[in-house]
Amino acid sequence: MMRRLHSSRRFSGSLLALALGLALPLAHAADKPAAGKPAASQPAASKPQGGEQFVDGIAAIVNKDVITMREVQDGVKRAKVDLKERGIQLPDDNVLQKQVLQRLIFDRLERQEADRLGIRVDDAQVTQAINMVASRNKLTPQQLRAEVEKNGLSWDDYRKSLREEIRTDRLRQRTIDNHIIITDAEVDAYLKDQARNPALQPQSAQAPVQEAPAAATGPVMLALGQILVRVPEGASPDTVASLRKKAEDILARLKRGDDFASVAAASSDGPEALEGGVMGVRPIDGWPDLFVKAVSNVPAGQVSGIIQSGNGFHILKVLQRGQAGAPAPARAAAPMPAPAAGRAAQGPVQVTQTHARHILIKTSAVMSDQQARQRLEQVRQRLESGSAKFEDMARQYSQDATAPQGGDLGWVNPGEMVPSFEAAMNSLKPGEISQPVESPFGWHLVQVLERRQKDVTDEMQRMQARQALFERRAGPAFEDWMEQLRAQAYIDNRLEKQERIEQNNR
């Protein structure tokens, strides 16, 4: 079902920080930069590789796609600039090449899967995102462009990077968000835990009746960095032991005082390695339980021990603890997320609820955006002419779980729907039907049936709890999904082969 729970990951801040080197507030989790990263020297011109030559300019093959050495070198140059701006010591060139190529391989896998699912991002959506980035950072689009170009990134490259970020965001929503189910029992247990744990409660203050789910009086926020030593799926006991030893050696270096960000950039297998390992900031209850427990007694500025998960061995650094609204750490990625469950200001919460229904047509390899929009336009014409009923059309055409109920979404609170859907819904008067509207789930026709004012204090608390539990799972679930995608793909890493050959020849 398309409503209510969706990842709060946002592309705008990460790209702005990447392009401008701005110290924005930290993002909620592991947002990846848009453009490539580090700079390294080009490998020696040519060396035989058992019949193939590295001189062909191919760094890797991912399924049927080629990643060229030029792409790696361009990414390396950008990464060197970015790392210097962040004050992070540059790894060796060969390490930077390896890190950049790994990022490019994951990016290519994401792009291929998005293409397979029919996820497209048009120029209008990119322009809308640029306007959002500029607005959030108190810039005009023209000023944003000037800053981007002043920092050495062409405007075309910036738009291309932003397009990729949007597509990845939509891919995450399409593949993960709909498959995470939070039960009422889990919400009940979460709220009980909140009540028992004073550290997770907002500051005491009576708030007046308000017209929206207001920002909290200060949820406890936690900013984390990570160094990940990845363990491949199906690794042998000897391989696992060797990788644990690698994690132990890294931890020993950190205990001796080595800079966490520099070690992360050189040694981490995590997607945020080239950002110095910075994963972001969230309400403390938005992090996976495994991480929260591991750093429960770790003061700001210190590192945890080694934590083992299904992905490998993690070492975490507590970058900051504090209330929402406190100054964020210097290394940044994106706008501060909205407070999570249990964080609503105390006192009654009055909202305008909307009773709505919709028809959803999903895009795919066989259903393009244009085809989906045209089909809904035809349905809308029938509805406007009175030759068909909305509920009948929903049962016949809608691909949402609400189709058997005639597309009825019930009463919807502000903030429950994805932004494009909510904006279209809010623009309608009762009885009106929207034009086709696009969301990460596909294309919709929306009809508003009625509106009402309601005290939703308890509902809002449960909704926020559900969202917090969802956020705990969404990030790790996407990482697991990407690992499975990688395991199923054909990947010929020629840089890695070249490195092994050179080591054997020494």
From Swiss-Prot:
GO biological process, one term: protein stabilization
Principal location: periplasm
Localization (cell): Periplasm
Chain ranges of the PpiC domain: 219-320, 351-450
InterPro entries: OMP_Chaperone_SurA (IPR050280), PPIase_dom_sf (IPR046357), PPIase_PpiC (IPR000297), PPIase_SurA (IPR023034), SurA_N (IPR015391), Trigger_fact/SurA_dom_sf (IPR027304)
UniProt KW keywords: Chaperone, Isomerase, Periplasm, Repeat, Rotamase, Signal
Catalytic activity: [protein]-peptidylproline (omega=180) = [protein]-peptidylproline (omega=0)
Any one annotated GO CC term: outer membrane-bounded periplasmic space
Gene Ontology molecular function terms on file: peptide binding; peptidyl-prolyl cis-trans isomerase activity; unfolded protein binding
Signal peptide interval: 1-29
Enzyme Commission identifier(s): 5.2.1.8
Role: Chaperone involved in the correct folding and assembly of outer membrane proteins. Recognizes specific patterns of aromatic residues and the orientation of their side chains, which are found more frequently in integral outer membrane proteins. May act in both early periplasmic and late outer membrane-associated steps of protein maturation.
Domain notes: The PPIase activity resides only in the second parvulin domain. The N-terminal region and the C-terminal tail are necessary and sufficient for the chaperone activity of SurA. The PPIase activity is dispensable for SurA to function as a chaperone. The N-terminal region and the C-terminal tail are also required for porin recognition.
UniProt cross-references to HAMAP family, sorted A to Z: Chaperone_SurA
Classification via PANTHER family: CHAPERONE SURA (PTHR47637:SF1)
Name the UniProt record assigns to this protein: Chaperone SurA
